[in-house]
Each structure stands twice: as structure tokens, then as C-alpha cells.
């Protein structure tokens, strides 16, 4: 019984220290640090590594074959209204799948991507590669009706552009929030 109480106390202590750090709290050691009256007021920013494409080779559950997947998360969050308020990053994915073939996919964590136009399944957005001119980006809705993801209608065209770009900017029409922009920046272009 005593061991269980000790273990519970350790778990609570660890959980509390993570909660304090993640929610702006300070630990006792940090709050009791001496302050300097002669501080310049400047704080050096931490060095952040540039984003990179993340490459994985998952296995398809049906065929048992592995496939290629590359993903990068947006450097900015969408500014959506209730009920989608809060941090909401996008993901740009390239997938070569044994069942579905080549796909270039744009997805958001929450919200509803709208597809303006006459064709319910076809979406036309604007996309910009590096400092080039904005171009029309034709996409298709997900077959399952998901509103958080769209697939490039011309994935080979998009793949060719991604192989050369370090900055990709996509403008999406979001339900009750208008046009929203996601920016994807990478240290190196897609290696595909």
C-alpha cells in the first residue's frame, strides 16, 4: 500500500510540473530566482530549427505493402470562429499509395474547407510557390465527405512544384471564416 501511495505522489508531482510549464505557471525554483534591477529588458529568442519535410513509410493494412508519405506542418494557424477557435494548423502531404496512387493533400486540424463553384466535388483555391505568382490550385473533396481535407486534382503538377519550393502558401475558403491562408516553409524542397 505504501508503495502505491509513493507512486501516486510521484505521478501527481510529474503531472503538476508538466501542467505548470504548459499553462504559464512557474516552478518554485524559477519563481525564486533573483531579479536584476539593471535588466535591459531584452530576452534572446531560442534558436528554432527550420521546418523539414517528415518522411515515413507506413504499411497499408489491406495490401500489406509499404507506401511513401511526406508531410510538413504549417508555420501558422488558421483564425477561425467558434466552434473551431484555437490553434488550428494545416498539413501538406505527399503520398504514393499502392491502392490510391499519387496524392498531394492539404488538410486542417478542424473546420470546414468549402469548395466554391458549380461542381460540388471540385474546389479551386490559390497557391503560391516561393515568391512566384499566385496560381489556381484545383482540388477534389475527400471521397468520404470529410471537410478537413482536399486532394490535388493534378498531383503530378503539384509534385513538380513542391520539388523546387521552400515556401508554399495556400489560400482556402473556410466555412463562416472566409479565405484563410496557410504557409508551409521548409529548409529544403521536397525530396521525392
Predicted regions and their residues:
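Alpha-helical transmembrane anchor segments and their immediate juxtamembrane flanks
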Residues: 1-26
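A generic "folded-domain core" signal
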Residues: 19-192
Amino acid at each position: 500500500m505504501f508503495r502505491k501511495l509513493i507512486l501516486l505522489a510521484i505521478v501527481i508531482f510529474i503531472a503538476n510540473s508538466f501542467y505548470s510549464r504548459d499553462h504559464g505557471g512557474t516552478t518554485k525554483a524559477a519563481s525564486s530566482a533573483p531579479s536584476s534591477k539593471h535588466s535591459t529588458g531584452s530576452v534572446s529568442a531560442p534558436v528554432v530549427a527550420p521546418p523539414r519535410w517528415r518522411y515515413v513509410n507506413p504499411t497499408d493494412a489491406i495490401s500489406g505493402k509499404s507506401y511513401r508519405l511526406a508531410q510538413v506542418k504549417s508555420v501558422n494557424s488558421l483564425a477561425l470562429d467558434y466552434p473551431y477557435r484555437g490553434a488550428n494548423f494545416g498539413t501538406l502531404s505527399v503520398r504514393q499509395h499502392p491502392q490510391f496512387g499519387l496524392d498531394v493533400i492539404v488538410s486542417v486540424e478542424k473546420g470546414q474547407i468549402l469548395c466554391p463553384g458549380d461542381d460540388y466535388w471540385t474546389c479551386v483555391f490559390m497557391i503560391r510557390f516561393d515568391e512566384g505568382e499566385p496560381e489556381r490550385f484545383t482540388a477534389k473533396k475527400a471521397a468520404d465527405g470529410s471537410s478537413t481535407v482536399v486532394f490535388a486534382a493534378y498531383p503530378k503538377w503539384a509534385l513538380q512544384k513542391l520539388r523546387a519550393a521552400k515556401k508554399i502558401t495556400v489560400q482556402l475558403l473556410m466555412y463562416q471564416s472566409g479565405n484563410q491562408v496557410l504557409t508551409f516553409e521548409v529548409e529544403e524542397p521536397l525530396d521525392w
